[in-house]
């Protein structure tokens, strides 16, 4: 909030501050604006209310001042008057209808302000006008919270007397008691507890009032709560007790009090850390640690990750505390779960004094930690030369490798502190020692662009052209030093932009400096690794422009030589990774810009695919071809750019492309791909360049087919505006209308339909005779069906005899079927397809009972037979659809005596497929012996079939109904044949 100079304010404001009513009247009479706003949107009435001058407030209001005006923090004059504890001002404002429920930007009402500012009289005036004193602000705090936080005992008393909820909690579930305890207001704490406040209440993170008091060192509150008998070792959600919190915050007096009251000094939290761990690590925990150790705290207790209190002192360099722990029995070489001792940790963080304390106390400097590294490894890796010097003084085998074969010299080279390298070399470290991947310390120094380390190692005789297991030399690693990784660490936020740029430039210079030094010392840039990549490839891949320039100076033919040695040329690598400056260097010396990688892709293809517009521009300006196709998909750079919607790249390519409709292996044009992927800008640009909207791929699909299929609305609209053909058919005869109906795009379907029906040759059948109505019904798109049925053209079935009604019921789209019947005629329920099957057959085939009910309610013929003589019941029975069979037998009363062309009844068919439940449902309605023993064309009775398929319950039921066990089929087999469970045996059991 700005502080304004009074002399710069309007005369009316100055008069209010001077308290001169006569001058104010005169100014108002001279038409001074009583509602004028300052820079903070405060009015003269805000000023008067702040000053608490009731007479001037009255005068301003009577002169037209707005009583509920809000400043830019939404504070009203009433808020200001209450904050100033002016009882008279509050009374005047309320008399003139000031809003007692007005909220500022923090949702605080005048009562909140009164509670926070100890405006007791003001609160007494306001409260009778409120419906509740428990209104919360944006943080969920009530007036009681504010009074407790600020220690206003009388205000707390008043609020409680007026019905304040003593256990109301804010958005973090903190009660007024939490805030009073944290701030150390003993009288308020006692008052709240006496009025029934829950002394063991917890906030969302499990903190109790005891935790709150302990964290802020409120010793009197802690004593009071302990005297009330609260659980001293109560934990929050992290498992921390009040003792943990006190130690973490360095509250030694509270720690002493808690220990005296019997707090568990070895209580672990959820991660296994005790109060001693916290005291060892915290900034002000020295006295806390002394108290804990003197009261029996276990100095060697370990957390879940194996860290002892001594480890914690090592992390933060608390060497005095480490001495205390060691003197009290702290195990100096205890290891955490990674195998690190406190000495490893101290070396990692560079705490020389602590290292000295540990070594003096007998710490093992040759102890292996994480990955079998010495403390010296960690000190060297993190460039702590003083720590290295201290650790070297203890003496051990300096070239001992870790789990990856790396010596301390490898670590120092990676860390980049040349002093560490010199110390190790002077102690006899072998600079040609290799790790398990064949890398020397020089490889590590080069990979991290540590120039002085490289210089030192080379000067002392390191082999500059030594190759590792991948065939890479230090020169390869220097060329491949990763600037992008540094960028990722810094992030891409606006505030880091300048630092990012500086870091990038610095790393580029370092890489060039390292490369130049290596080249001057006879490093061979032509050496290829096992993948055929040389230094040029790596410099190009990682975008080191200066490195490439150095290499060009060294050997002008080197770039051309690099193009034929590996699957990808330097040009490809620079283009793919978007390094346009490196690319420009390469382009200066390369002849063939259209060289292909192993998949036939050019550098321009890769740059376009990745969206690197600057690289695309550089390649085009040097004459790279935009029409070269790869070997796999036969795509061009135009196709590559639209796949990911890289419109800037596409625009550059189209400026030099002769044909925007070039096709790939599937016959797809860039426009088709742009529409398919929904890249609106790319579609717009291609249409501007007059790309063909009616071109079809090898399957006959156009861009419009793709747009409708993928649902990209704006792309479709742009195509329609170009008068695209909407009746074009794909290889299966489907038009965009078919696709719209199949995908449920009713709006497009309506628009396309209007255009289609206005054309002379309007054929809307695909190669199988299916119309858009078939497709809409099959996929259950009611909105599309509604659109189609609005046209008389679709109010009669035509096309494939497997009608739209068949399509609807076979997929259980009951509403769609109902719409068809209502719009056309109920007679369609008995229409037949080429095999003589009705929609009832289709519904029975798919076991859709609701559709069966619908069809039969519109007089579908339940016993209609198809060309094979099968009824709907037979369909359901043969396919084992219990629901459909049950409905057709028991509700629809289907004829059970009907037979198909092979003389099978529905019972035969159910039994033949092993559908026992269906067979039993049918059998339950059969009493006639003629049906029980009915024979099909193979002379088989239901008993033959049931017995052969092992349907025991069906066999039992058939026998109970008198089925003949002596019936013989055409193979002279009786129903008790050897392949089945014996029907005769079943009869004997009965």
UniProtKB/Swiss-Prot annotation:
Taxonomic lineage of the native organism: Eukaryota, Metazoa, Chordata, Craniata, Vertebrata
Record-given protein name: Serine/threonine-protein phosphatase 6 regulatory ankyrin repeat subunit B
The keyword Repeat belongs to this UniProt entry's keyword annotation: yes
Coiled coil: none
Pfam families to which the protein is assigned, alphabetical: Ank, Ank_2, Ank_4
InterPro entries per UniProt: Ankyrin_rpt (IPR002110), Ankyrin_rpt-contain_sf (IPR036770)
Keyword Repeat belongs to the record: yes
Functional summary from the UniProt entry: Putative regulatory subunit of protein phosphatase 6 (PP6) that may be involved in the recognition of phosphoprotein substrates.
Quaternary structure and interacting proteins, as annotated: Protein phosphatase 6 (PP6) holoenzyme is proposed to be a heterotrimeric complex formed by the catalytic subunit, a SAPS domain-containing subunit (PP6R) and an ankyrin repeat-domain containing regulatory subunit (ARS).
PANTHER family (UniProt xref): ANKYRIN REPEAT AND PROTEIN KINASE DOMAIN-CONTAINING PROTEIN, SERINE_THREONINE-PROTEIN PHOSPHATASE 6 REGULATORY ANKYRIN REPEAT SUBUNIT A
Annotated keywords: ANK repeat, Repeat
ANK repeat start-end pairs: 7-36, 40-69, 73-102, 106-135, 139-168, 172-201, 205-234, 238-267, 271-301, 305-334, 338-367, 371-400, 404-433, 437-466, 470-499, 531-560, 566-595, 599-628, 633-662, 666-695, 699-728, 732-761, 768-797, 800-829, 835-864, 868-898, 902-931, 938-967
PROSITE patterns, per the entry: ANK_REP_REGION (PS50297), ANK_REPEAT (PS50088)
């Amino acid at each position: 909030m700005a502080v304004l100079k009074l002399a710069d304010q309007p005369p009316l404001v100055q008069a209010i501050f001077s308290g001169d009513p006569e001058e104010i009247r005169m100014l108002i009479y001279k038409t001074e604006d009583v509602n004028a706003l300052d820079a903070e949107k405060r009015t003269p009435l805000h000023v008067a209310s702040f000053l608490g001058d009731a007479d001037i407030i009255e005068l301003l209001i009577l002169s037209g001042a707005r009583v509920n005006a809000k400043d830019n923090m939404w504070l009203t004059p009433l808020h200001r008057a209450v904050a100033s504890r002016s009882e008279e001002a509050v009374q005047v404002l309320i008399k003139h209808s000031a809003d007692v429920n007005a909220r500022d930007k923090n949702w605080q009402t005048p009562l909140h302000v009164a509670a926070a500012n100890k405006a007791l009289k003001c609160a007494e005036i306001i409260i009778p006008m409120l419906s509740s004193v428990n209104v919360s602000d944006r943080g969920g705090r009530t007036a009681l919270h504010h009074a407790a936080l600020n220690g206003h005992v009388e205000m707390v008393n008043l609020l409680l007397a007026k019905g304040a909820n003593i256990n109301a909690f804010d958005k973090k579930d903190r009660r007024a008691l939490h805030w009073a305890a944290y701030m150390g207001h003993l009288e308020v704490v006692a008052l709240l507890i006496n009025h029934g406040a829950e002394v063991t209440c917890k906030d969302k993170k499990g903190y109790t009032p005891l935790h709150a008091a302990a964290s802020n060192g409120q010793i009197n509150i802690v004593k009071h709560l302990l005297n009330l008998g609260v659980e001293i070792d109560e934990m929050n959600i992290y498992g921390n007790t009040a003792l943990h919190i006190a130690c973490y915050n360095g509250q030694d007096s509270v720690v002493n009090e808690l220990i005296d009251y019997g707090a568990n000094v070895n209580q672990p939290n959820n991660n296994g850390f005790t109060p001693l761990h916290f005291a060892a690590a915290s900034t002000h925990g020295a006295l806390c640690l002394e108290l804990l150790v003197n009261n029996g705290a276990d100095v060697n207790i370990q957390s879940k990750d194996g860290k002892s209190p001594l480890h914690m002192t090592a992390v933060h360099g608390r060497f005095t505390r480490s001495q205390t722990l060691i003197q009290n029995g702290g195990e100096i070489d205890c290891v955490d779960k990674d195998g690190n001792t406190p000495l490893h940790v101290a070396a990692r963080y560079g705490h020389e004094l602590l290292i000295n304390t540990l070594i003096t106390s007998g710490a093992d400097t040759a102890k292996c930690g994480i990955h079998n590294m010495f403390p010296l490894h960690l000190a060297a890796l993190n460039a702590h030369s003083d720590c290295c010097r201290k650790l070297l003084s203890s003496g051990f085998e300096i070239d001992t490798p870790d789990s990856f074969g790396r010596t301390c010299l490898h670590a120092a080279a990676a860390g980049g502190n040349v002093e560490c390298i010199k110390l190790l070399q002077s102690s006899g470290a072998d600079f040609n020692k290799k790790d398990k991947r064949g890398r020397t310390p020089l490889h590590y120094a080069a990979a991290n662009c540590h120039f002085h380390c490289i210089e030192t190692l080379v000067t002392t005789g390191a082999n500059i052209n030594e190759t590792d297991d991948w065939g890479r030399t230090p020169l390869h690693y220097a060329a491949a030093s990763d600037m992008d990784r540094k960028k990722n660490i810094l992030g891409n936020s606006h505030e880091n932009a300048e630092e990012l740029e500086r870091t990038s430039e610095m790393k580029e210079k370092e890489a060039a400096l390292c490369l130049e030094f290596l080249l001057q010392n006879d490093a061979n840039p032509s050496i290829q690794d096992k993948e055929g990549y040389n230094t040029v490839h790596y410099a190009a891949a990682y975008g080191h422009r200066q490195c490439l320039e150095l290499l060009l100076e060294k050997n002008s033919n080197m770039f051309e030589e690099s193009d034929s040695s590996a699957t990808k040329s330097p040009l490809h690598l620079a283009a793919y990774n978007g390094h346009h400056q490196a690319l420009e260097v390469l382009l200066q010396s390369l002849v063939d810009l259209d060289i292909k990688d192993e998949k036939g892709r050019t550098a321009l293809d890769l740059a376009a695919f990745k969206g690197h517009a600057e690289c695309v521009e550089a390649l085009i300006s040097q004459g790279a071809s935009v029409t070269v196709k790869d070997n796999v998909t036969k795509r061009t750079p135009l196709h590559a750019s639209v796949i990911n919607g890289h419109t800037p790249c596409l625009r550059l390519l189209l400026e030099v492309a002769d044909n925007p409709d070039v096709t790939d292996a599937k016959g797809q044009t860039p426009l088709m791909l742009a529409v398919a992927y929904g890249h609106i800008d790319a579609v717009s640009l291609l249409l501007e360049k007059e790309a063909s909207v009616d071109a079809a791929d090898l399957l006959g699909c156009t861009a419009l087919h793709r747009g409708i299929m993928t649902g990209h609305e704006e792309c479709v609209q742009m195509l329609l505006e170009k008068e695209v053909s909407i009746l074009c058919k794909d290889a299966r005869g489907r038009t965009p209308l078919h696709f719209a109906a199949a995908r449920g795009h009713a709006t497009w379907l309506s628009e396309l339909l209007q255009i289609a029906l206005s054309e002379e040759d309007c054929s809307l059948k695909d190669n199988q005779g299916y119309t858009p109505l078939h497709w809409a019904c099959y996929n259950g798109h009611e909105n599309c069906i509604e659109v189609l049925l609005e046209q008389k053209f679709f109010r009669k079935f035509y096309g494939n005899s497997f009608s739209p009604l068949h399509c609807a019921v076979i997929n259980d789209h009951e509403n769609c079927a109902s719409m068809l019947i209502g719009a056309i005629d109920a007679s369609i329920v008995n229409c037949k397809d080429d095999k003589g099957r009705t929609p009832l057959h289709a519904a029975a085939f798919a076991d859709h009972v609701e559709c069966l009910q619908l069809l039969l309610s519109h007089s579908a013929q339940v016993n209609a037979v198809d060309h094979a003589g099968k009824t709907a019941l037979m369909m359901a029975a043969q396919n084992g659809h219990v629901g459909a069979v049950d409905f057709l037998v028991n509700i629809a009363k289907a004829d059970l005596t009907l037979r198909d062309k092979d003389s099978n009844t529905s019972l035969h068919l159910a039994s033949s497929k092993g559908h026992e439940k269906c067979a039993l449902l049918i059998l339950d309605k059969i009493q006639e012996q003629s049906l029980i023993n009915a024979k099909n064309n193979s002379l088989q009775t239901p008993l033959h079939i049931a017995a052969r398929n092992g349907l025991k319950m069906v066999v039992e039921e058939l026998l109970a109904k008198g089925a003949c066990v002596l019936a013989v089929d055409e193979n002279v087999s009786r129903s008790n044949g050897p392949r089945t469970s014996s029907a005769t045996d079943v009869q004997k059991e009965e």
